[in-house]
């Protein structure tokens, strides 16, 4: 589960702009390159929420209120399981800044300033294991991946591999295509070599098949 909070000066974003920006931010964070199985991505989107805030006061470091006539400042705070933070930070900062820039361009403001000046701050905050709850109980990062992928495992197992590039396989947990030549995240089960996009998918698969992990 990921929560994206957007802080913007009052009046900068109208209702339609807030809705469009929220959709943009979710699409930007989920991405399209190297995507997991579509159904898994839909589950991830369903667990992603965007909240837009308009603070009553906005003071900058030079101790003056933000002037409504100035180009608007933004703060985006992304809360995600701590185990995901390091891997997702660079991607999130780049993509979310771009989503804001597209919104600025639509409003007739200079989108390039968001990369040239510190007008868009992005914080990726890792939530400690056991500190995120859903369905009335704590949910760790492994629990969330399990929740998002479990309903789709049978469909992932039936995905055709006929058109895959040589040396690649489909991650049996999330459906991502994995290059066996560039990863050591593999497991052999019943004579079949499986590859995984990250260690958590590998851990889930190993636990479900009773395979001990030595590394």
Predicted regions and their residues:
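Short metal-binding segments enriched for Cys and/or His
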Residues: 198-215
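Short, low-complexity, polybasic intrinsically disordered segments
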Residues: 60-67, 130-153
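Short, solvent-exposed beta-alpha or beta-beta edge segments that form flexible loop/patches at the rim
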Residues: 46-70
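Short, non-transmembrane amphipathic alpha-helical segments
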Residues: 21-33, 92-112
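Short, hydrophobic beta-strand segments
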Residues: 2-9, 72-84
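Short linker/helix segments within small regulatory modules
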Residues: 184-193
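Short cysteine-rich clusters marking metal-coordination/redox-active sites
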Residues: 171-175
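Short, flexible, mixed-charge glycine/proline-rich loop motifs
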Residues: 157-168, 188-189
């Amino acid at each position: 589960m990921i929560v994206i909070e957007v802080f913007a000066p009052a009046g900068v974003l109208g209702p339609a702009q807030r809705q469009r920006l929220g959709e943009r931010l979710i699409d930007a964070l989920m991405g399209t390159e190297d995507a997991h199985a579509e159904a898994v991505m839909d589950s991830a989107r369903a667990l992603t929420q965007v909240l837009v805030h308009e603070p009553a006061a906005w003071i900058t470091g030079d101790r003056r209120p933000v002037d409504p006539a100035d180009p608007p400042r933004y703060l985006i705070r992304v809360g995600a399981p701590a185990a995901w933070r390091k891997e997702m930070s660079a991607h999130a900062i780049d993509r979310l800044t771009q989503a804001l820039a597209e919104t600025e361009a639509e409003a007739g403001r200079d989108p390039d300033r968001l990369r040239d000046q510190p007008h868009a701050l992005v914080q990726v905050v890792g939530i400690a294991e056991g500190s995120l709850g859903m369905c009335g109980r704590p949910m760790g990062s492994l629990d969330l991946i399990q929740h998002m992928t479990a309903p789709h495992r049978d469909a992932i197992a039936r995905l055709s591999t006929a058109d895959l590039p040589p040396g690649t396989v489909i991650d049996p947990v999330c459906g991502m295509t994995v290059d066996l030549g560039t990863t050591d995240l593999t497991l052999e089960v019943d004579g079949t070599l499986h590859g995984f996009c990250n260690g958590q998918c590998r851990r889930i698969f190993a636990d479900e098949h009773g395979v001990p992990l030595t590394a």
